[in-house]
From Swiss-Prot:
Source domain of life: Bacteria
PANTHER family named in the record: 4-HYDROXY-2-OXOGLUTARATE ALDOLASE, MITOCHONDRIAL, DIHYDRODIPICOLINATE SYNTHASE
Active site (UniProt): 137, 165
Lineage of origin: Bacteria, Pseudomonadati, Pseudomonadota, Betaproteobacteria, Nitrosomonadales
Subunit note: Homotetramer; dimer of dimers.
Official protein name in the record: 4-hydroxy-tetrahydrodipicolinate synthase
Length: 300
């Protein structure tokens, strides 16, 4: 694991927006400072949780640039650069490299349902076009296409394809990769509820929704798992369990943006087709936050 450069709790950071849906860059900068202070080990910007499908190309560039500048080398910045167009994924990855991002996160192409060979050729083309460490991102619940472990292992032979975010929640699948992939190929959980199990099997970190709300506790859980301190890791995860589950009570990032807004860190702005968290879930999420020891800045 020492050969993996980026490890630990990597927040899949939300994108703050004003009520009219415009980007709130001031809050975005403050949010990055908050994560640095709270011990987050890396910032993943403009991913699923960052509402990448509804930001335009210029905004996508601006968010990457702002994240890199605000982080200022204090923590690694991983730029979401995935697209279902290989050309677009290449363009975004080139921008991320030139902006100074430490790595890119490239989602499995969605909607057009490529074959396994198509997935291999897509990611290889991106890797050959731009020399930035590339992390694959498999989330078949959203993309429909599902990259098989054998395809991942083929891609792991390409020097600048350095890891995968596996959001399937399938621990057996993750362990299979840990057993067969090169030692310097990072396996990140993309499923908060099962992340601890993968970490204890040798996983390298978690790209986390929960870390938006409980960054310090997520960091502590990872550190304990890496140290083999099962009791401490389980104790941290026990406090986080309801958050892991209830942050998906409606489609991500609806609940997490509401929760971060209750902490006073951002406003509640979303872009259609996402809509605000249903009122009936507010108390459920407040209770989950309370179990994790999170203070609410906004009173009921």
């Amino acid at each position: 694991m020492d050969n993996v450069a980026i490890k630990g709790s990597l927040v899949a950071i939300v994108t703050p927006m004003h009520e009219n849906g415009e980007l709130d860059l001031e809050r975005f900068q403050s949010l990055i400072d908050f994560h640095v202070t709270e011990g987050t080990d890396g910032i993943v910007v403009v991913g699923t949780t960052g509402e990448s499908p509804t930001v335009d190309f210029e905004e996508h560039h601006l968010l990457i640039k702002t994240a890199v500048e605000q982080a200022a080398g204090r923590v690694p910045v991983i730029a979401g650069t995935g697209a279902n167009s290989t050309r677009e994924a290449i363009d975004l990855s080139i921008y991320a490299k030139n902006a100074g991002a430490d790595a890119s996160l490239s989602v499995v192409p969605y909607y057009n349902k490529p074959t396994q060979e198509g997935l291999y050729q897509h990611f290889r083309a991106v890797a050959e076009a731009v020399d930035i460490p590339q992390i694959l991102y498999n989330v078949p619940g959203r993309t429909v296409a599902d990259i098989a472990n054998d395809t991942v292992l083929r891609l792991a032979q390409i020097p600048n394809i350095v890891g995968i975010k596996d959001a399937t929640g399938d621990i057996g699948r993750g362990f299979d990769l840990l057993c067969r992939a090169p030692e310097d190929f990072a396996i990140y959980s993309g499923d908060d509820a099962s992340a601890l199990a993968l970490l204890l099997l040798g996983g390298h970190g978690v790209i986390s929704v929960t870390a938006n709300v409980a960054p310090k506790l997520m960091h502590e859980m990872c550190i304990a798992a890496f140290a083999g301190d099962l009791a401490a890791a389980r104790a941290a995860n026990r406090k986080l369990l309801r958050l892991h589950l209830d942050l998906f009570i409606e489609a991500n990032p609806i609940p997490v943006k509401w929760a971060v807004a209750q902490m006073g860190l951002i406003g509640e702005g979303l872009r259609l087709p996402l809509t605000p968290l249903s009122n009936r879930y507010h108390q459920t999420l407040r209770e989950a936050m309370s179990e994790a020891g999170i203070d609410l800045a906004i009173s009921v």
